[in-house]
């Protein structure tokens, strides 16, 4: 689950998550974030460091 907003500045980042996730498979993450308009380093951090915890927790159900 991606957070809806950046923890630091409050900008909505969930709207770009799906496109970001698909595009980083074939393009550098920095270029993708530039194209999507994610310029603040705090918002970039949110996308770069996100770990899909739900997938890891499913193993333990």
From Swiss-Prot:
Subcellular localization: Cytoplasm
Any one GO molecular function term: DNA-directed RNA polymerase activity
InterPro entries with a match to the protein in the record: RNA_pol_su_RPB10, RNA_pol_suN_Zn-BS, RPABC5/Rpb10
Cofactor descriptive note: Binds 1 zinc ion.
Keyword Transit peptide set for record: no
Sorted UniProt keywords: Cytoplasm, DNA-directed RNA polymerase, Metal-binding, Nucleotidyltransferase, Transcription, Transferase, Zinc
GO biological process, one term: DNA-templated transcription
Highest taxon above the source species: Archaea
Cofactor(s) recorded in Swiss-Prot or TrEMBL: Zn(2+)
tRNA-binding among keywords: no
Enzyme class: transferase
Binding site for Zn(2+): 6, 9, 42-43
Catalyzed chemical reaction(s): RNA(n) + a ribonucleoside 5'-triphosphate = RNA(n+1) + diphosphate
One cellular-component annotation, GO: cytoplasm
EC number: 2.7.7.6
Assembly: Part of the RNA polymerase complex.
Family: Belongs to the archaeal Rpo10/eukaryotic RPB10 RNA polymerase subunit family.
PANTHER family membership: DNA-DIRECTED RNA POLYMERASES I, II, AND III SUBUNIT RPABC5 (PTHR23431:SF3), DNA-DIRECTED RNA POLYMERASES I, II, AND III SUBUNIT RPABC5 FAMILY MEMBER (PTHR23431)
Functional description taken from the UniProt entry: DNA-dependent RNA polymerase (RNAP) catalyzes the transcription of DNA into RNA using the four ribonucleoside triphosphates as substrates.
Protein's name according to its UniProt entry: DNA-directed RNA polymerase subunit Rpo10
Organism name: Methanothrix thermoacetophila (strain DSM 6194 / JCM 14653 / NBRC 101360 / PT) (Methanosaeta thermophila)
């Amino acid at each position: 689950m991606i957070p809806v907003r950046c923890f630091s500045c409050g900008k909505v980042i969930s709207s770009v998550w799906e496109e970001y996730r698909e595009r980083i498979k074939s393009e550098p993450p920095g270029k993708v974030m530039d194209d999507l308009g994610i310029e603040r380093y705090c918002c970039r951090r949110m996308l770069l460091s996100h770990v899909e915890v739900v997938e890891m927790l499913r193993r333990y159900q």
